[in-house]
Amino acid sequence: MFCTRGLVFFAFPAGLDIEFTGLRSNLSGPQQISLFDLPSEWYLKTRQSVQQFTICQIGLSVFSAIEGEANKYTAHSCNFYLFPTTFGILDSEFSFQASSVQFLNQYGFNYNKFLKNGIPYMNEEQEKKIRHDILTGNWRVRSSPDKDQIKVVIDEVTRWLDLAKEGDWMTLPGITGFQAFEVQLVLRQALPNIWTVLKDEGVVVKKVSKQHRWYLQNTSCDRESCWKENILLSARGFSAFFQMLVKAQKPLVGHNMMMDLLHLHEKFFRPLPESYDQFKQNIHSLFPVLIDTKSVTKDIWKEMNFPRVSNLSKVYEVLNSDLNPTKNSGPEIVHASRCEKYVETKCPHEAAYDAFLCGSVLLKVAHLLLQKVHRIDPVPESSFPQYLDVLAPYVNQVNLIRAGVPKINFSGPDYPGIRPPILILSVKRWPGVSEQQVCHKFQNLCKFDVRRLTRSQFLLLTNKFKDARNILKEYRGHPTLCISLYRYWRHSPNVNCLLQVCGIVTAWALLAFTLGRSGP
């Protein structure tokens, strides 16, 4: 992690990918995401899943230009296994989703590294709580296993103290990480005539006088306040790196990165707010330049008539094939020393590998766009600032999966995309039909999101124009299932109710007018 820190400030884009213990809660009915959802509705539904699951791996690939070589970049790719901080009052709860575990296991994910060696992290609110407890002396060990072990340690040290002389010392071997900090904190609080030091072989306990203890606490390089700050720094773990990434203000690149951004906010910044607009503002202040390669490749794929692909690895393969007219003139990317794992080895769904693919795809697609602008190949003296210029329409446009808009604009209002029209299904002779039954009825033909309009009417929405055309054609003239284009002024129950009320009022007014004229 430390070898990557300095590079972040000198890099151009930073590719990011995150793996989770689960993606989306198995919520039913109105809590499921839908093509009918406004972005704010989609956000509130997804927020629950983000709070339920956690990050198990983050991959970062930092791209830096090679000095003196035109359009040549070095990629520094790193994997970080993470595990929530368990320290003091912090004891997070999270879920595993069976399908996500199976998926990652299929690609060789090392769950032992996640569970045993994961780097701790916390968000700003958690840091404030633990900082207050440690600095005010209100810190307590909360974990039962830790309490048991620390009790054993205190008993051992107390027995040793009865026989030891001032200046004697003992070592508590095999105590590392947060446990070492906890042991030292408890021992220093409980025993006024000892001092502790953390060394490679374990925690060293030394018997000292109370005067010498006061001196060590207030004047040594390991004085109490500095030592507690070091505890906080270690407890923050990866969060310190996250804050440095924010401070660098470099373009952050991902692929279908919306879930990544939600988890970054929740796990490292602050708990996700209820307000969707506040979430957008927060993310934009953290990362002013976001580029989602899914949004970029969507458009360029149509223009170039590239073959349809289903994932990031396939996108990368197409851009490195002869199908790409700028294959030989595009940016050259080499792996840095000590980051050469991916030179010959493909590791799909390993976070650092996918992060490397994100950055590489961005550079290659940007070069393709630049060539289209200049209409010459090779483009003279291509550079990353030029790439950012041609990528401007895609900056802060993050792809949104299954919602009422195709993407979220983090630097302004969201714009409605071009989507297939809403269809209306009118059902005859099928009493008590449910939304699930309607979905099941059409599942062999195409996938629709279904929303009930009235007792016998349902709205149907798909993200493919072809599916909308097919179902209109297939069910034309059907005796019990009538499907047509939805027209708000014609089909909305609210509009129909309003028209009926207006009709009644008009009729009464006309009747009153008629009776008034025929009177004496």
UniProtKB/Swiss-Prot annotation:
Cofactor requirements of the protein: Mg(2+)
EC number: 3.1.13.4
Keywords (A to Z) from UniProt: Endoplasmic reticulum, Exonuclease, Hydrolase, Magnesium, Membrane, Metal-binding, Nonsense-mediated mRNA decay, Nuclease, RNA-binding, Transmembrane, Transmembrane helix
Disulphide bonds in the chain: none
Binding site for Mg(2+): D17, E19, D260, D354
Superkingdom of origin: Eukaryota
Originating gene: PNLDC1
CC annotations in GO: endoplasmic reticulum; endoplasmic reticulum membrane; nucleus
Descriptive protein name: Poly(A)-specific ribonuclease PNLDC1
Catalytic function, reaction form: Exonucleolytic cleavage of poly(A) to 5'-AMP
Protein family (similarity comment): Belongs to the CAF1 family.
Enzyme type, top EC level: hydrolase
Keyword Metal-binding: yes
Principal subcellular localization: endoplasmic reticulum
Membrane topology note: Single-pass membrane protein
